[in-house]
Amino acid sequence: PYLNPKMAGTQYDGFLKTPDENEYIPLLERTSCIRRWDISPELPGAHDFAKYTRSKGIMTAVTHTEAEYDEIKAAFAIGFSHAAHFYNAMPGFHKRREYKYEGTVESVYLTEGMTVEVIADGIHLPATILKLVYKLKGVENTCLVTDALAYAACDGTVPIDPRYIIEDGVCKMADHSALAGSLATMDILVRTMVKKANIPLEDAVRMASE
């Protein structure tokens, strides 16, 4: 729930909050099944959270964020090692009044050693961006994720939450304001990387499986 409300996407606003050690420490003391936790690094308390999760061997990932370079650099130094659904729910290069600023996307590119994942369904990201991620981050630092909902592989005939619609091979908000989730399966991601982004098959399979 520790996400920037401005970048929450289709998350329920009422569940969003800043990290609270009285919540996450008891939880993580009682279980060893959590292997990764995604969080917005600019939130108050996020660095203490990342230090704690790192001490537990849990991957902490940047997500749903407006963080710029200094914030990403500091987050990486603390223990944020990965960017979740790269490009989605995070800004790129942008302008505020007359000045231009790097976004989270450029900041992650500049952070050597930070790994990324992409929703390679050809809808969340176009082939040109998939090529760019592959070129700049490389097969060693990139993985493919479906980010799929429970409706994965459905064709739109299955009744779903009325807030969403299935259209053009993806789940969207009913008002068409945003994508709401993927319907892709892993084979679709590999096929997209090979056929649309012209990535070698062996690298596409590696990014989908390692």
Language model region names:
Residues 12-17, 84-88, 163-168:
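A polyampholytic, Gly/Pro-enriched intrinsically disordered region
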